[in-house]
Every structure is written in C-alpha cells, then in structure tokens.
C-alpha cells in the first residue's frame, strides 16, 4: 500500500491496498532486535504485577511488526523494554548484536540516540523550529551531519517538501506526525518504535502516516515495531504479535483488518486470551 490519498482509511472493515511485490525492498538479513525470556515485574508482595512473563520474540530487519492486545496485556511495556526506555527485571534485550540490558546509562543513551527511532502518539515537535529543523534536530544535538541522499529520500516519501519551512502550527495533525516519523527515520536507525502513532489523528491522516511507515519498510528497508489497538492500523504491518497477560499468545502474518479484529474478539471480557 503506497497511497496516502484522502481515500485511504483505517476502518477495520476496509483492507488497505498493498505495495506491489515488485516494489518491496528485499529484507535485510538478521535481526534488528530480539528479546530472550524478557520479564518485567512492578512492585513487591501484594502489589507485585508481572507485566511481561518471560517473553521471547525476534524482530527481523526490514519487517513491519504490529503489537496488539487488550489494555494491561503488556504491549507498551514490551515496546519500552525493547527500546531501552524501561529496565528489564530479568532476561535479555538485543538491538542488533548488543545486549542493552548490560549497558550503563551513558552507553544506553548513546545506543538509543544512534540506533533507535521513536514515534509517539503526541507529535513532540518544537513549535519554534521549522519542519526540516525538527527533522534534523536529534542529529544536530548529536553533532552529526545527515546523509543528504537518505534525508532527501525520507522527505520525498513523506511528501512534505513544500512544507519544510513551515512551523508545526502551520501544519495539520497528519502533517505534524509525518514530520515526527521523518525525524525518527532521518538518522537511519536500526529500528523504529511507534507507540499508537495514529491515536490523535482522524482516519484520513492516520492512513497517510501508516502508509508512510509501511513504505519506509517495504521501499526503504527500515524496521518498524508499532503498538496499536486498531485492527485497521495493524493491517498495514507484515506481522502482528498478540499479547495477553504479559505473554505472546498468537501471531499473524500478512494480516487483514477483519482477521485481526476476529482474533481480538477472542480475548474474554477481563482481557485474558481465549482459545475459543
């Protein structure tokens, strides 16, 4: 699915078009990230909560993975631990070949800066900077010059070249989130984590952002992991990982919105996974 036209939709009853196979970039070999028996526990005694229960998952390079599950299933905690934003209680997390659970704070900060891109529900753009200044800000802070050819590719893919001199208040919500996506990709990170990236957008703007994330994977060879509650958004991914009670309970390859919606219905009223 390459279109970011106004007709695109994240309606769970409507499957988005797919990028033609001839336009899909070959997947890079190896893993962008992985977790090995990752466990996260909050509290002690009567207040002890196991948010992640010995999860093992591989995230191949050049793949778009969506993470889904009911509220409290551990999906955001999983993303935060994979991205090095939260510490694991037990187990290991790798970005590339580096076990980030062994890094001190300084090296972990450097790893996140150099190897990880983030897209959040809030756009987090600086209002006094232009779109292009927001896109290059992380590299400017790190004292790194952008790869101009790659930056041009990213800018052309978000289709906002004519808006680069505009400040966030002069952009629509969808345009601001596309700028945030470009900022995450500008440094060519090992992996991009997106936490409900369309949560503040209408269906048209959300489809534009999801289309951009999908093209960044299929045409540019990036790796994206997205947490979402929306079956329509998940259908843009190559693979969906379903969480329940802090464990991976199912996976789906080449998902459709309808298939994802049906799987989500199999969680019971309390949010626990069901085999029914």
Give residue ranges: language-model regions:
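Catalytic Walker B motif of ABC-type/P-loop ATPase nucleotide-binding domains
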Residues: 192-195
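Conserved ABC transporter NBD signature motif
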Residues: 91-99
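Conserved catalytic motifs of ABC-family nucleotide-binding domains
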Residues: 188
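Conserved ABC ATPase signature
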Residues: 167-177
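Short coil-to-helix segment of the ABC ATPase nucleotide-binding domain corresponding to the Q-loop/switch region
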Residues: 129-137
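Conserved beta-strand-loop-alpha-helix hinge in the C-terminal portion
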Residues: 247-271
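Conserved ABC ATPase "signature" region
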Residues: 98-99, 145-163
